[in-house]
């Protein structure tokens, strides 16, 4: 129904009365309400899920029938059957009437009346739609509500029609209904028998007449709006019904009505196409049942779109004829947006596939637009005209697309919410569970496992108790049998039965329901006699066949043969009295043994015992202890009880009443044995003023638990409490419930008896007295084992008396008391009457002292309770253990180590260890003769993160306000009183070695902050700061300074500072820190952090400077470090200490020798004098103070001033800059002084005094950016006059703090000077009108040479001058150098210092200007500078050649021609080069050329350079005439690589006429041939496998590789391309031939026009000599001649040419290598036998006898 509660009841009753009244039946409202309540009881789902439709109503009937079978017909109201029968008949007639939607909201009275009027009558809507108008009205309403749910945007309701018109329609509708009833007659009332005999599965409906559905459907369809699909049905036309004006509908129906009034609305809602007859295909529209759509939407939402049940609903929808628009709207309305996109995509893909497959078979019958509803079939009105075959294809694709949606998995939320109700039968729950699971996943093993799991998890607690014993072994059928008669009474009864039989509840249930039949277990029935399975008691053989054996001799009296339990003797056989016979539960063998009862309490045997309220109550003093060592008093139950889980918390009576002893409170806790049997005792607190009966709160932890009377179930612990001054709500608690009483502690009352305690030492038990006055544990001599070693001590123990002859244990002893243990080193006293346990062991046992006074007891506890506070945990870089072996120690040091370790163990600073960490320890002897234990923690320190310094500097006492009272306290052994975090202790372990490995090393670890750990100071500071934080908060107007273990307290009032001291000591003690009372300093004459506070002045403690041990650099560094430490209290300037600082210059070796200079001795004497009078003042924060910058020599000095010096501020001796002007030092002091003022007083000084005039100060602000920065944010005043005090008069002696000799503009009558310097050490000073002054020093750098030139100018010229230099460094020295402080760290310190002295001696001004060099500009200044610059050059041609060769490694000819040096010098440079001689002498260029001019013939090949890696394939092209070379490094030698190389070669070298290569595949490929043909280049190849044909390029390979190796050894190259480019540059543009021409010049230069010589040459074919002819070219091994009668030249070996001369003695022609004709006999006899001329070629080359001679003549 969707409406629950009172509104739902009211609505149902109204509908029920209205329906029955239309049939002439009247039902009372009380009867209707009774029926509705019974309906909810039988069908609890009806109010939320059901509706008044035939299907739901039949379901109600089935459940009513089941209810009658289970509870009887008498349990059903008398009016239930008749009402149900009447409503069933009404619903059968009206079929799908849906009154209340599952989505309905709460309704008002008006909505109720309106809904009833429109839904229960034959409304005007029926007249609009025909006789089936009610069904259409339901569709309208349900569509509206469902659309609201889907789209979350309900349609706007139209305004309701006029009320009078509405009443008129209602009246007409009632008349129609009345006529219908008269025609059908009255329905007779059915009795209960007819109800029970009803066929519940009869779902047939009586046929009804339909109106003209086509017209009505046309009114309810809109082409532009489809919300939900309905079905259309093809039927024969029926007579058109009478139409009347309808009531104004609401919701979606209103929107449809409005659309109908506007025009043709063919599709107001989607339809399906159902053909009942093939005779008439006229479509008639019928709405698709909304219940089906709701079911589909619910299944998708709860189970997923691909669940089996969901697919069944989809198949049901697909059984109708739906258009594409219908399917789209259905999917969009029910699927999620993501799933809808998936469905739409799949639908479109499958439609396309179907159209492609049917292209040949059904051509023209189906198209993609038809299946998708696009194009001309876009509108729904056009889609209804589709044939059934097309609609069948649409449905097939839609269902396949739906099934293709991936499954989202099991809806866990749905199954998790499906739980068994408290009153629901288990079999009903299993039925619902199986239905839900099978809807989500198919039947199978997986679904069965899920059902069994949920059958246990989602069952109610009662069924879970019944199922639990058989959960793993039983089946679903076993679960159902176990829960068949489930009820709390059954569970409790079974628990009682299990308890009576002595069985566990689970065992009993397993035997009863564990899979057997008839309520028996799997092993059969259980015998109540022996407890075994498989038989019952009457068949038990043990009971029938066995008899009890006769008793033996009584173990009690030993006088007769009877059972001990039957013994009645009062005396034994010897006449001794016997104790009473015990008859408690432990002696009963028939009872199950449980927790043993308490000892007999008073009242156990009195009248009424625990059940009689008249029994006298017990008091606390009547309660017994279980054992002598019991901590609590036993509380026993005074009543037999059986508890189950359903009982919850129960109160067990004890008959013990308050009040508790004075000053105590009670804590009730359970016994551990109770939990084993399933009894849980809830703890409770009993106040001391509680007077009622003490009861124990218990509950059963599992199933049933039996508590016997007298059984101990809890303990009452009596504890003392601290009474705090908290507000009291009531005066006395009286007999009210439990509560709390304040802080609770364990206690043992002090009595006349001595407080003795047993403690184990090394496993041996000792009894001793707890002595709070004993510092150390003392063992009585009679208790000390004789075999335990001891040694005598020189000390004596003092107490009330004095004990002499005291011995001490030679080894530490391990003590143990309960769960606590430790190490002690006790004393042994022979005369001691008993052992004394001292505070060294009591503090580890956690002994407390308490008194009745809250104040006293809290004070005692503060002193007695050991603090559990630890230092912060250290952050570690790694958890990897560090183990460094312990090195051996000498005997003396080993003994000292053992003694120190023993002492630290006694003090609790060490503990034994098994840590995987270990670092060495050692001892050193102090000056006092005592030994000190040290641990090398450097390795451990390296594994921890540095915590940093919490206090980067020392607190200064000058910041303590002037006039305040001061107290200073010191903490004793601060590190050793702060515990390490327990997680960190293991990392500080060490080992104590043993000589000769006589025993295993003893291992210990620190429990406190170890010395030497780098974070110990930080942890100490944090811990102490945390301890005193409460005091800081309490006394916020005080001044508290804490640094490490020193604490300073200050306050204007002496009484308050004393109060602060008391609070501070208490706070420190509370954290385990101890104050040295003897070191507390008060009020005046105080020593704090090396200073002496006396009144308002502060001085440094007396310091004696020893000079007798100042020998090394390290000694002087320590001395100056100490001086810097005390300088804030000394009027000692940096200039006065400069001689001491200068001693540090020189060798940086710490042990290098140093000596005191006379100046340094004077500085030390001055410092001693100043130390005796050094005083500073404490500041008054209420008065202003100043920062004074003092004009002192070397660097300025500053001080904070307030009627005296508060603190001196100095600058470092050495500035980080080489030259720092004096005014910059002043800005540094201002910044440092302001920072120090804020650091000490949290405030800027009120005034700043500068050592300049107002004019100078303004100029500095304008010219120097450092000055505005130093005053940034300063809100005080700047003054220019120091305070008038004799202390500051020394500053007036210093002069020259502002430059005055350097002019900022050129001087009008100044002499012009030019200076320059070079890196070769030559400096030039050119003074106008004089000869240049040149100085050379090869050790000088360029800067030194420049400065030497300037120094020369200052030495030579005393008149005003204008100096010009092209050095920016020199001009940057001025004017700062005039007042600057020079850093001695620079190498030019001497030159700069000399220059500064010369400036200070001058009487005339000078100007220093900068001029750019090497500009070539006209003018006297540029020419003068160029002249000076030229004088610095001394580089020779030979040096230039050497530098060039070092860079390029060119040949000797290139060096000779380029730098004009001799042949021998050039060859010597090449010979001395470390890289070039490895490759031999380079041959002369021009070897074996073949082209007669550039770009005629090229040779190309590939060589491999392995050093290039992936780019090892180097493609090389060389011009055979000029030897111009080009190469590229590539990743391969394929065709594409050759093409790219050729393209780059053309851009680099031009276009050749011919290219010659070898026969490599890439060179003979078609792509290469086509490429060369396009460029009109001829291509030839040599003889295969004959490298001589490529001799030139092969030689080029060697040249390239040789040049690459030279360059690679000499320099650094980033890429192979970089290196190759440099090599090509050298080969083409640097190397030269003997004529001084480079390859580039030969390649691109003009062809030489020199006359060619005439020669005689020998024809190789005929052997005859010919000529004279012109010699074109010649070289070693070759020659080219051009016969006068030939068209092309001919190549011949050079030995076959002879110079042609007129005379015999003619000089050979140059270029013929001075060859002479052969003089052998053979040559002289040769004659021209064959006169034929050599073969001619068209390319300007020649061959002889068909042989290509170009391949001949290698290098």
Curated annotation (Swiss-Prot):
Organism of derivation: Mouse mammary tumor virus (strain BR6) (MMTV)
Zinc finger feature spans (CCHC-type): 525-542, 552-569
Covalent lipidation (N-myristoyl glycine), chain numbering: 2
Domain Reverse transcriptase: 905-1093
Name of protein: Gag-Pro-Pol polyprotein
Keyword line: Aspartyl protease, Capsid protein, DNA integration, DNA recombination, DNA-binding, DNA-directed DNA polymerase, Endonuclease, Hydrolase, Lipoprotein, Magnesium, Metal-binding, Multifunctional enzyme, Myristate, Nuclease, Nucleotidyltransferase, Protease, Repeat, RNA-binding, RNA-directed DNA polymerase, Transferase, Viral genome integration, Viral matrix protein, Viral nucleoprotein, Virion, Virus entry into host cell, Zinc, Zinc-finger
Residues binding Mg(2+) 2: 1316, 1346, 1366, 1429
Residue numbers spanned by region Disordered: 151-191, 572-631, 1699-1755
Cofactor note: The RT polymerase active site binds 2 magnesium ions. Magnesium ions are required for NC-dUTPase activity.
Biased composition (Basic and acidic residues): 151-169, 178-191, 1716-1740
Annotated GO MF terms: aspartic-type endopeptidase activity; DNA binding; DNA-directed DNA polymerase activity; dUTP diphosphatase activity; RNA stem-loop binding; RNA-directed DNA polymerase activity; RNA-DNA hybrid ribonuclease activity; structural constituent of virion
